């Protein structure tokens, strides 16, 4: 398939720039025999007792830092991945690239050594005993490039799921932003439980596809984890006829990456899985996801799940009804198309 097959006109006015007041007040598009437009807090009406929600519990770190080179030039650092207790993989924006072996000075007198560069990413060594304390003190929330404003205090909590546990992401698993503790408790009373996987989302999630033939696209790699507890519960749910409902595309990528010889395996690893039309889903039955950019890998995953024509139909409806798109936008709840 060609990249142009996944294009559509997205009015800039529909790209949400701020979160709404209450998480669960966002809008939700549901496709059954017809298109249903409701609020997210009504989603429980479309679940069945015995369904299982799988959520990504990664936690967004304050990954943007500002510093000064030895020459006095200003730099912006965007952390991509934590490597160990004081080393990170990062991108650096500067008028001139920093030299390998040079220092970058942060505002709290912490030095960073520019250790090496590979494939556009720098390995940086922080001269600190507590990297996470440092980031929490002077780091900034790494808002996506399509949010055209500076971050604020509200983003610290709202660009984070209420169930975020494991530090490591530089972008939020945005489908999960619509849940609050009250909704999760209500669903549990209905017999709909939730468990977690982890995928630390990197900045590669925002990288545009540049190949005309989408099959030639090389997907970015991200660290993930799925526990034996989650694997066992998924297997039990399926055996009992319940649905596996993935909250977000990152959860889908973990689940579909964790199969070996047709069996779901607990593991820690990395995945560069690229899901596009013709992919056969083996674990996920239903998907909750936000609205995505034209020609993005996330849009292709949705197209693989429900069919490209159906995706374009739903997106046309969403644009006509002025749904909000992307991270702080609205959501859709989809059933897998088993006829693809």
Curated annotation (Swiss-Prot):
Main enzyme class: transferase
GO BP annotations listed: queuosine biosynthetic process; tRNA wobble guanine modification
Pathway entry: tRNA modification; tRNA-queuosine biosynthesis
Gene Ontology terms for molecular function: S-adenosylmethionine:tRNA ribosyltransferase-isomerase activity
Keywords: Cytoplasm, Queuosine biosynthesis, S-adenosyl-L-methionine, Transferase
This protein's record includes keyword Cytoplasm: yes
Catalytic activity, reaction form: 7-aminomethyl-7-carbaguanosine(34) in tRNA + S-adenosyl-L-methionine = epoxyqueuosine(34) in tRNA + adenine + L-methionine + 2 H(+)
Primary localisation category: cytoplasm
E.C. code: 2.4.99.17
Compartments where found: Cytoplasm
NCBIfam families the UniProt entry points to: PRK00147.1, queA
Subunit structure: Monomer.
PANTHER family registered for this protein in UniProt: S-ADENOSYLMETHIONINE:TRNA RIBOSYLTRANSFERASE-ISOMERASE
Similarity comment: Belongs to the QueA family.
Annotated protein name in UniProt: S-adenosylmethionine:tRNA ribosyltransferase-isomerase
Organism: Vesicomyosocius okutanii subsp. Calyptogena okutanii (strain HA)
Gene that encodes it: queA
């Amino acid at each position: 398939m060609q990249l142009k097959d996944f294009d559509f006109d997205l009015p800039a006015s529909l790209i949400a720039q701020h979160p709404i007041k209450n998480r669960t007040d966002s809008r939700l598009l549901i496709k059954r025999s017809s298109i249903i437009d409701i609020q997210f807090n009504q989603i429980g009406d479309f679940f069945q007792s015995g369904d299982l929600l799988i959520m990504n519990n990664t936690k967004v770190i304050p990954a943007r830092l500002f510093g000064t080179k030895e020459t006095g030039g200003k730099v912006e650092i965007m952390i991509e991945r934590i490597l160990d207790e004081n080393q990170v993989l990062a991108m650096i924006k500067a008028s001139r690239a920093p030299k390998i072996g040079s220092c970058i000075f942060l505002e709290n007198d912490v030095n960073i050594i520019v250790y090496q560069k590979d494939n556009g990413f720098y390995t940086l060594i922080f001269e600190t005993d507590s990297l996470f304390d440092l980031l929490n003190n002077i780091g900034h929330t790494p808002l996506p490039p399509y949010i055209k404003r500076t971050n604020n205090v509200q983003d610290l909590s709202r660009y984070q799921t209420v169930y975020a546990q494991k530090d490591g992401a530089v972008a939020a698993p945005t489908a999960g932003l619509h849940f609050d503790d009250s909704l999760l408790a209500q669903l549990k009373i209905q017999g709909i439980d939730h468990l977690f996987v982890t995928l630390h989302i990197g900045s590669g999630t925002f990288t545009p596809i540049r190949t005309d033939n989408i099959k030639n696209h090389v997907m970015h790699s991200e660290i993930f984890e799925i526990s034996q507890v989650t694997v066992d519960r998924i297997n039990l749910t399926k055996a009992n006829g319940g649905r596996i409902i993935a909250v977000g595309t990152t959860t889908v990528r973990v689940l579909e990456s964790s199969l070996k010889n047709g069996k779901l395996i607990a593991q820690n690893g990395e995945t560069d899985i690229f899901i596009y039309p013709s992919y056969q889903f083996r674990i996920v039955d239903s998907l909750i996801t936000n609205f995505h950019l034209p020609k993005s890998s996330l849009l292709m995953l949705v197209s693989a799940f429900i069919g490209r024509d159906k995706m374009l139909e739903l997106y046309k409806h969403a644009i006509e009804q002025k749904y909000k798109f992307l991270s702080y936008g609205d959501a859709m709840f989809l059933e897998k198309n088993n006829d693809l």
